[in-house]
């Protein structure tokens, strides 16, 4: 199962791959069960993972800045 694939949650790159996957599923509604769209699906999952890791890194940096600012204000 994929996470929410709403366009406002993802980068343009991932949105393009998501739309290609949806198009593939629509055009090949039977072949999709036999792996016809698997390559696009793998690319989408790789893009979503990269996005997730980037968000995680950004949040970690933000948290560290907040902690450092809090420690500096205590001194």
Curated annotation (Swiss-Prot):
Residues 11-55 form the CHCH domain. A motif (Cx9C motif 2) lies at residues 37-47. GO terms for cellular component: cytosol; mitochondrion. This is COX assembly mitochondrial protein 2 homolog. InterPro entries: Cyt_c_biogenesis_Cmc1-like. Its main location: mitochondrion. It comes from Taeniopygia guttata (Zebra finch). A motif (Cx9C motif 1) lies at residues 14-24. Keywords: Disulfide bond, Mitochondrion. PROSITE patterns: CHCH. May be involved in cytochrome c oxidase biogenesis. Belongs to the CMC family. Disulfide bonds join 14-47, 24-37. It is found in: Mitochondrion.
């Amino acid at each position: 199962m994929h996470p929410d694939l709403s366009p406002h949650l993802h980068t343009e790159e991932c949105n393009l791959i998501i739309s290609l996957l949806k198009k593939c599923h629509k055009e090949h509604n039977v072949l999709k069960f036999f792996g016809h769209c698997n390559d696009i699906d793998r690319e989408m999952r790789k893009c979503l993972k990269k996005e997730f890791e980037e968000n995680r890194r950004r949040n970690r940096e933000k948290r560290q800045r907040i902690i450092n600012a809090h420690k500096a204000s205590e001194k």
